[in-house]
Amino acid sequence: MPVEDHFPEPLVFNPASGIHKHTVILLHGRGGSADAFGPALLNTALPVAGTAISTQQDGPHGRRRTLGEDNGVSTDASAAPSVCDGASAKLYNHISPITLAQALPHARFVFPTAPKQRATVYKRSIIRQWFDDWHLGFVDDKVDSRYDLGLQTTELVSTVEYLYRLIAEEARLVGDTRKVILGGISQGCVASLVASLLWKGEEELGGVVGMCGWLPYISQMRAQLVGRDGQESRDTTWGEDLEEGAGFDPFERSASPDCDMDLPGGIDGKGSVKSALEWLRGELDILETQSGSSDVLRSSVPAILCHGQDDDKVDIAKASESAEFLPALGLEPLRFKEYAGVGHEFSSEILSDIAVFIQDVLGEPSI
């Protein structure tokens, strides 16, 4: 049960340009708050003078902020960023440091704060979290081979419905839901992914941003895409080629491992995809209060998932599994990026990638 029965007022930063064209909603992780997460993220300097991100196994990763399930404690580490050719480099023509807010001058940034709840994993200690859950060492939403029996469901429902109210208000202010970006770190990423999958407004979201997160209920939704005999359903794109050990590697590195990679996916299997999403909606008992027909399959929504290879709280395997599965549910094209030397945190390079992604999906010119 929540200790607080309401969501605190979000922390809002108006556009640096004074002109509101887009809104970016970003959720903190468990134990954090908007007051700690928002300013730290917006005050982090992005790489400069033609530099861009690198995902090399042995590459340094610049200034980092640890802001996940850590009560908002931050740590910094300085190193020179690496250079990557390709689309990611287009943002960085400036010669002095800029921030995410300056890179997206027409964006209004909204940082919600989760209510205080009792956390099962912390012996029911009171902490801010978007939903309750078991320790992430367990997989497939199971504990001791048992389904989690809805432990995370109640608060996750409240969070998703709250996010829908925020999205609707920001869409009203900016004039179009497609100008709203939703995302977060850790638990905030989870809530954003679920909310984006179940959103049934007349217009789709502009995009989804995830850091250090994962998609819950994958095994249950995959069961809706694959027949009971384990073979490919006739109306789904998920089949033997995507089964474990089939020899297909959706994360196979290209000749330039530093740069973006769009993952395969699709929503050709409309019946099964709809079944998977309706299972998730039914599990969370979220009513279709938004306008739009449940008989019409959602359109694609672009997304980016960023994850540190040294994350000791959310294993990168959970993120890569999520990145493999999400395009089949309509989050595509999806960019999945790994960062050597980065833990359960965001870094300047992660924020650089996010800035480029948002510029791409919103059609904003680089500065």
Kindly give the residue locations of the regions a language model identified.
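The feature captures the conserved acid-bearing segment of alpha/beta-hydrolase catalytic domains
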Residues: 12-18, 207, 213-364
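Short, hydrophobic alpha-helical segments
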Residues: 167, 171, 358-367
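Serine-hydrolase catalytic machinery in alpha/beta-hydrolase-like enzymes
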Residues: 5-12, 22-179
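Gly/Ala-rich beta-loop-alpha elbow adjacent to hydrolase catalytic centers
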Residues: 183-188, 192
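Short, well-ordered alpha-helices that flank and scaffold nucleotide-derived cofactor binding pockets
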Residues: 39-46, 197-201, 324, 328
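Fungal eukaryote-biased detector of long internal structured cores
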Residues: 1-2, 12, 17, 172-177, ...
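Residue in the alpha/beta-hydrolase core beta-strand immediately N-terminal to the catalytic nucleophile
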Residues: 179-181, 207-209
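Conserved hydrolase catalytic core segment
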Residues: 194-206, 215-216
